[in-house]
Design a protein with these regions (language model features):
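Short, well-structured alpha-helical segments in soluble
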Residues: 60-73, 90-92, 260-269
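Short beta-strand segments enriched in small/hydrophobic residues
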Residues: 2-26, 175-184
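Short catalytic helix/loop segments, enriched in acidic residues and glycine
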Residues: 25-41
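Flexible loop/turn segments at secondary-structure boundaries
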Residues: 18-20, 57-58, 84-87, 109-110, ...
């Protein structure tokens, strides 16, 4: 959980002074016990910090402003122990710039039927206070997640955990800098978009970075540094030397290691956590020059390994997917099955098991590999460098997962997710690349059709662990459209949803 160890979620309890000082003391004691219990549950990956009971508008405003100014705080949980008049929350909610979760719960699980009296009723008014708080949030159009359930319930805790991971991802997104090594692939529409609006709405900052400057880093990487990294490769991967021959194999692997070192150093020096490449922009040097120094191949191996470390990646200049993958990686830290950048490549029509092969030229993250990846070198005839090229080769784990993408529709961004089932492919002896084979849900015909109708991309950020609930929370926190495709999708209902959304997102701006 290293990604979360320096982060906090603040818990603010709502009450009022109407019920006297003794009630406030009890509210405070109960709140501390509940926060300690949630932290001890092991279900919530980010530490919850109790920030006291708010009994007035000034107290609410003070804690919300403090949350905004504390980089450790990624979100606020509110709970109304007693009745807390909602007008006292207006200024604080207007100030709040962090994600909000409203927890509708209660200190006691059951009503003490034999002893209940008006003192108990006045103190334990979550049923009353939370509805009042919910009303003002709805009236103010405050985006928030509402979790209803007993605080010791594992189901409620897991919903909080989802929100907490997403809040961490959103906080990270506001600090992401994505470097484009080269621009978007010419004439491709879906990987392009409005980078200014992207930063304004989602927080990601995208910059062009000259490949010539990257080459300056490459030239400074020593043979000794590259050889040291190659030794690491030997420990992690199965070495498989095929038609390239041993001399070419190790030369290409060594140069791939240099590319990885150079890329990592640039990203670190520039404070970047995401990047894109373009196979047609790998430097201007002539590879046939006897004194050539530079990228002699697409930096696919480097991209695969950097993705595993948490750097966002997008091929062909796809900065939206690079940024989204970074957020996906942050959200799923500590989860078991992994995530990757993937691309729809070719179809396999086989009745109920009709599927789409996911691959790329090289750049698939080994986190999703079912077995130990093989380090191979093969000819790649795409792009400016048509050369023998190093890459990790594997097939993905089987099982259900979610692919996600963000598209620019001109007047707004749309987040799309789709449930898929990764299945085992047949052997592909002449396709030495990493791959996944999946069946879109609910069927190929409906799933693929809905994705196309939504304007989905051919690139996606995929995870076995991150569910629709995460992406729904993510879109809500950022105020962007979200549509999901799953086992319950029908084309007619999905088309109607898209039509309604067109009107809603046009008119919704007038409500804020």
């Amino acid at each position: 959980m290293k990604a979360f160890e320096n982060l906090e979620i603040w818990w603010v309890t709502g009450a009022q002074l109407l019920y006297g000082g003794d009630a406030v003391v009890q509210v405070d004691s109960h709140s501390k016990e509940m926060v300690e219990g949630l932290n001890a549950s092991g279900n919530i990956p980010i530490k919850i910090v109790y920030k006291g009971t708010a009994n007035s508008s000034n107290e609410v405003e003070a804690v919300m402003k403090a949350a905004n100014n504390d980089d450790k705080c990624v979100g606020i949980i509110t709970w109304m122990h007693t009745f807390s008049p909602a007008k006292m929350w207006i200024k604080g909610l207007q100030d709040l710039q962090k994600p909000l979760l409203h927890f509708h719960t209660q200190y006691n699980a059951e009503i003490p039927w034999d002893t209940i009296d008006m003192d108990f009723m006045n103190l334990n008014q979550s049923a009353h206070g939370d509805i009042e708080f919910g009303h003002i949030c709805t009236r103010m159009r405050v985006a928030r997640k509402v979790v209803c359930g007993y605080w010791k319930s594992e189901e409620a805790q897991k919903k909080i955990a989802v929100w907490a991971r997403v809040a961490a991802g959103v906080a990270d997104a506001k600090n992401v800098r994505c470097l484009m090594f080269g621009m978007n692939m010419n004439n491709v529409a879906v990987t392009d978009g409005d980078r200014v609006e992207f930063e304004q709405r989602l927080g990601y900052h995208v910059d062009y970075y000259p490949v010539s400057s990257l080459m300056d880093y490459f030239k400074k990487v020593t043979d000794a540094e590259a050889c040291e990294l190659v030794e690491e490769y030997k420990k992690l991967y199965t070495i498989k030397i095929d038609e390239s021959g041993e001399e070419v194999y190790w030369e290409k692997v060594k140069n791939a290691a240099k590319a990885e070192i150079a890329l990592r150093r640039v990203l670190k020096d520039e404070g970047a956590t995401a990047f894109t490449t373009n196979f047609d922009d790998l430097g201007d040097a002539d590879i046939d020059d006897p004194n050539f120094v530079g990228f002699d191949q697409i930096p696919g191996l480097a991209s695969q390994r950097l993705m595993q470390e948490g750097y966002g990646f997008g091929a062909e200049g796809d900065w939206k997917t690079a940024c989204l993958y970074r957020t996906l990686w942050v959200m799923q830290q500590g989860m078991p099955r992994g995530c990757s950048f993937l691309e729809d490549y070719t179809l396999n029509f086989a009745g109920d098991q009709s599927s789409c092969l996911q691959s790329h030229m090289l750049e698939i993250c080994p986190m999703i590999a079912t077995d130990k990846p093989k380090l191979e070198v093969h000819f790649l005839g795409i792009g400016i460098r048509k050369q023998q090229t190093a890459r990790l080769v594997f097939t993905s784990k089987t099982g259900y997962g979610i692919k996600a993408t963000v598209v620019d529709l001109g007047n707004r961004f749309r987040l799309i997710s789709q449930e898929v089932e990764c299945i085992e492919p047949k052997p592909m002896p002449h396709l030495p690349v990493a791959s996944a084979l999946w069946v879109p849900q609910p069927t190929f015909e409906i799933g693929a059709g809905a994705w196309i109708l939504a304007g989905g991309t051919h690139h996606s950020a995929f995870s076995y662990d991150i569910t629709e609930e995460y992406w729904e929370d993510f879109a809500e926190m950022l105020g962007i459209e979200y549509v999901k495709i799953n086992k319950n999708t029908s084309i007619s209902e999905f088309k109607h949803e898209l039509q309604v959304n067109e009107v809603y997102y046009m008119l919704n701006k007038a409500l804020r």
